[in-house]
Design a protein with these regions (language model features):
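Phosphate/NTP-binding elements of NTP-utilizing enzymes
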Residues: 1-169
Length: 169
């Protein structure tokens, strides 16, 4: 998907992680600043939305700024590199990306806050669609433990996935 649809050659670690997310339910990536973690997450989100239908992709991070100004802007950048047919299928809003003709398929941004961990409750996948519920966690080291505990309940759906990236602390 990344090489064909986005016309990019991933770094070795990104390629390995892309293969891992296709075959494993959970992956975590720890690395320093500026190595392409947010680009990687953008690729994963677009891949899930366009290849797993229906698909729900709740995305969280330690701050609204990280979600809106970093992850969402990176997603928009990479979406512009998709073939025109795929681009036309995506609707971008400030905190949500939807597929035009499949209302059950979306990615949504929810800030991870200790005082409102329930923001990640209520998501359910489709058991016969691998990856139909996929949690994306940006800057995972800054996300409070209670948020992970709340999200864990939804991960009982067969085929659900979790992708976490962050800097080691």
């Amino acid at each position: 998907f990344v090489t064909t649809c986005l016309n990019v050659k991933p770094q070795k670690w990104q390629e390995e992680a892309l293969h891992a997310i296709a075959t494993k339910p959970r992956i975590a990536i720890r690395s320093s600043h500026g190595v392409g973690k947010t680009a990687f997450l953008s690729w994963v989100i677009l891949w899930l939305l366009l290849t797993r239908v229906p698909c729900k992709v709740p995305c969280t991070a330690n701050s609204a700024n990280q979600l809106e100004q970093v992850l969402w802007s990176e997603l928009q950048k990479w979406a512009k590199r998709l073939p025109t047919g795929f681009q036309k299928e995506l609707n971008f809003a400030s905190d949500k990306i939807t597929l035009k003709n499949v209302k059950e398929s979306f990615a949504v941004a929810r800030t991870a806050r200790k005082d409102s961990p329930e923001a990640l409750q209520g998501f359910h996948g489709t058991p016969d669609v691998d990856g139909s519920l996929s949690f994306i966690v940006e800057e995972a080291s800054g996300v409070p433990d209670i948020v992970f505990e709340v999200a864990q309940g939804a991960m009982s759906t067969e085929g659900s996935k979790t992708v976490m990236v962050g800097n080691p602390t």
